[in-house]
Structure formats: C-alpha cells, structure tokens
Amino acid sequence: MNILKKLFGGQKTTEEVREMKEKDFDKVKYDGVRALRMHQFDLAAKFLEQALQLNAEDLECRDYLSQAYISMGDLQQAYAQLQKISEAQSDNMAVLLRMADVAYMMEDYIAMTDVCDKALQLDAENVETYFFYARACRGLGDAPRAVSMLTEAIGKRGDFYAARLLRGSILLDQAQLSEAELDATFLYEHIPGNEDVLLLKARVEKAQGKMEEAEQTYGKVMEVNPFSIDAYRERSEVRRSLGDSGGAAEDEAAAKEMGAEIPEPSEGIEQKIKEKMQQMDPYKVFHNE
C-alpha cells in the first residue's frame, strides 16, 4: 500500500497528518524553549506563538510564552496567557499567584485583588496570597487593609519575614511608629544582617527622633552595602540634626558621587520586569528545567 501511495501520490491518512502536526509542534515548541533559555525573547515568542497555532491546548507552551512576554515587557499578553491557563486549571494556585505577580508588575491593583480573592477561595491558608493582597491594597491606598492582610499572613506563619518587613514599612508610612518599631525589632533579632531590615530599623529610629541610634544603624546598612545611596542620603539628614555639618556634607557628597557613577535604577513597571527576568518561573508551575 505504501509503495502504491508513493507511485500514485496517494493522500495521507488522518493519522499521518496528525503525527506530522505533532512532530511540527514539538519541534517549534522546542525551538521556542531553547530561545527562551538563551534569552532570545523575541524569537522565543515567535516560535511559541507558532506552536500554539498548531496546538492551542498545550498549557506548558502558554506558560513559556508568558515568560517570554514578561521578559519583553509585554505584560498584558503575559497576563492573557496565564489567564487561559487558569481557565483550564481553575484550581491551580500557582498560576493564580503568578497572575497576581504580573498584575503587580502592571500596577493593576484591581486585577490583583480579583485574583487574590479567587486564590483565597481555593486556599485560605496560603500566606503568599495574603502578601500579594496586601501589596494590592497598598497600591490602592488602603493601608489599614494592607496591614490587616499582612497580620493575617504573619499569624499563619511567624517566620514570614517579607510580610513583616512590608507591614513595618507601611506602618512607618502611616506614622504608627511604635507598631513599626515592633516589626523592625523582631526582624533585627532574627535576621540582623539584612540590608532591608537595617534600613527599616534606621528609618523608624529616625522618625522617632532617636538620631544617635539611627546614625549607628545607618552605618550598619553601609557595612552590608557600601553603595546604599539611600543610607548615605538619609544619614546626612540625621547627622545634620545632630549638629555634625561636616559629616552630613560628607554623606551628601558620597550619595551624590554614587548617584553619578551608578546608572539610575529603573522605576515602576520597568524595574518590576527586570526583577522578574531574574527569576523565571518562580513557582515552578510545570517543573521543567
């Protein structure tokens, strides 16, 4: 039969067409994944888009495509791909958390709250959901609710340091200094060498008017990170309030010099995208390496 088909050009069977389509899909998808891992994001997106035209049901392919879109800065498209995955796997918490993460990068805090609501319906014990919810509330200017969400998360996991750090920062912003001090002190007792913790502690002390303590703590920040522009800039204010004009001038000069030498950090969405590129597939949704 195969000889006759070759001689007379017989049409391929449905099974043969399906097998060829599967082979084409696997090849294009593999090319896309390889390009993604080589950080050739535009090329990866083209291959993966083509692969989905051959098999729109492949959720793993959509996950890789969402990563490519994130790296390209096309967050709307990335979110759309994750949304399709979530529609197919409505009980997939990891995908919902990734959607919340992308919504955070887009600064779409309404979308974040919607996704977090869905996640809490699935698992009210997941502390990361409360953390994302708090970020969304902070973005919406609802500090009390953000603090409430973080308190819930910390109550469920006492060593959730990121949540306590964020809560301390929000409390500081709200001038709730005694409460912020509790978080800063707790964090300092548990992770004393952390730059962000030291910076929070110094800022709380500065806000409380404990200038001598704040000066020392800013010094510890600099020991951990000698290039912390914020630490130099803020310590200059502390030193000036202590009457140390010379020290304040030195800190101001150091901050100015570092600011001129180091490229200005990206802000907002651009910075969030950059951070995301450094942690592709953080939740290991499909566990592919």
What are these regions, as identified by a protein language model?
Residues Q50-A51, K84-I85, K118-A119, E152-A153, ...:
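Canonical positions in the second alpha-helix
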Residues R37-M38, S71-M72, M105-M106, G139-L140, ...:
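Register position in tetratricopeptide repeats
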Residues M1-V17, G247-E289:
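Terminal, low-structured helical/coil segments at or just beyond the last alpha-helical repeat
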Residues R18-E60, Y64-D74, A94, R98-E107, ...:
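Alpha-helical segment of the N-proximal tetratricopeptide repeat
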